[in-house]
């Protein structure tokens, strides 16, 4: 793929998501989703490997099915109510179909099976776009229509996502699959709190995207996709290893890192609404996520072989070039917890 083609695809991604975010008409919103879907497929096949082509086909079939269901629900709602406005969903059947379609686009359980498979077959940068930028449009739609959606369905999808995302990530050795199940669990947190405090979903999504982009950038810089090479990284790139450890702990929600803030605020909001059972379940699922993050950290630190390095300088491969934005991303993803009172005020 030529650089010009890549630039066009990235611009189409930006255009499609922007169209969805700024639309109040179901047809324009659906067009934005389709532009984003069609634009990312060439990026998924960037390496021209059979696995990447397979993942692109899986992604296309899943997203096409979800788009078909979403358009059917919007058309049914228009037929029943006579308008295409995004905020006015008066039909229960349309509301239910829209919820399932958006859950399929987000990768919420039980529609999550495509996420780890597609991510495993794609490159690190394509996977980063899938888990960050491609979540903006579906989350924004749920954010806008959440008052009209069925709360019981949303709660079921959210809790099952946090449980399955944490449980299935326990036995993974591929870093991309670990990040996929982490994304499923985080999406469950966001969809759950959107029922009670939608603004908190925006904060949660922002911090999640920040940490995920930083982590994928480190993986791409060090060219690591499995947990086994992490045991050799400490001698080659100690700064990168430290960055991976801090970012994983932040994603796991361990204080005093940035990722603790959204989990703290979500559980606090659930307790305010006298939903102690839900808060307890979320806290337990957060421990599941933290456990498989700790397994990766264990592989990168405590399984290091005793090696003697007689050189003054650490060895780096030719592909190891530190992006200028990486230090900023790592710092923001790990040190923003003291700003939590400001987050609460803004919310």
Curated annotation (Swiss-Prot):
Disulfide cysteine pairs (residue numbers): none
One annotated GO biological process: mitochondrial electron transport, NADH to ubiquinone
Domain of life of the organism encoding this protein: Eukaryota
Topology of this chain in the membrane: Multi-pass membrane protein
Pfam families in the cross-refs: NADH_dehy_S2_C, Proton_antipo_M
GO molecular function annotation: NADH dehydrogenase (ubiquinone) activity
Location of this chain's protein in the cell: Mitochondrion inner membrane
Enzyme class: translocase
Family: Belongs to the complex I subunit 2 family.
Subunit structure: Core subunit of respiratory chain NADH dehydrogenase (Complex I) which is composed of 45 different subunits. Interacts with TMEM242.
Name of the protein described by the UniProt record: NADH-ubiquinone oxidoreductase chain 2
Originating organism: Ornithorhynchus anatinus (Duckbill platypus)
This protein's encoding gene: MT-ND2
């Amino acid at each position: 793929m030529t650089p010009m083609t890549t630039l066009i695809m990235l611009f189409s991604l930006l255009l499609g998501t922007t169209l969805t975010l700024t639309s109040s008409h179901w047809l324009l919103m659906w067009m934005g989703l389709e532009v984003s879907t069609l634009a990312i497929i060439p990026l998924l096949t960037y390496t021209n490997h059979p696995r990447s082509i397979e993942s692109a086909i899986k992604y296309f079939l899943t997203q096409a099915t979800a788009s078909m269901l979403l358009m059917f629900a919007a058309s049914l709602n228009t037929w029943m109510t006579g308008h295409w406005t995004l905020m006015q969903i008066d039909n229960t059947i349309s509301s239910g179909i829209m919820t399932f379609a958006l859950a399929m686009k987000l990768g919420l359980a039980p529609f999550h099976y495509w996420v780890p498979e597609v991510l495993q077959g794609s490159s690190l940068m394509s996977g980063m776009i899938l888990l960050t930028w491609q979540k903006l449009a579906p989350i924004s739609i749920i954010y806008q229509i959440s008052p009209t959606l069925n709360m019981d369905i949303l709660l079921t999808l959210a809790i099952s996502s946090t449980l399955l995302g944490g449980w299935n990530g326990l036995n993974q050795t591929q870093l991309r699959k670990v990040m996929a199940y982490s994304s499923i669990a985080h999406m469950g947190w966001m969809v759950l709190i959107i029922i009670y405090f939608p603004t908190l979903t925006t904060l949660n999504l922002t911090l999640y995207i920040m940490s995920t982009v930083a982590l994928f950038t480190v993986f791409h810089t060090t060219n690591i996709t499995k947990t086994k090479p992490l045991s050799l990284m400490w001698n080659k790139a100690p700064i990168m290893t430290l960055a991976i450890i801090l970012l994983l702990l932040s994603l796991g929600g361990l204080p005093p890192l940035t990722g603790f803030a959204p989990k703290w605020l979500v559980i606090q909001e659930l307790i305010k609404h006298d939903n102690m059972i839900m808060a307890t379940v979320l806290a337990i699922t957060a421990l599941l996520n933290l456990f498989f993050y700790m397994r990766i950290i264990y592989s990168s630190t405590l399984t290091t072989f005793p090696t003697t390095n007689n050189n003054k300088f650490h060895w780096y491969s030719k592909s190891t070039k530190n992006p200028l934005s990486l230090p900023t991303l790592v710092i923001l993803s790990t040190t923003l917890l003291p700003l939590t009172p400001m987050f609460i005020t803004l919310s």
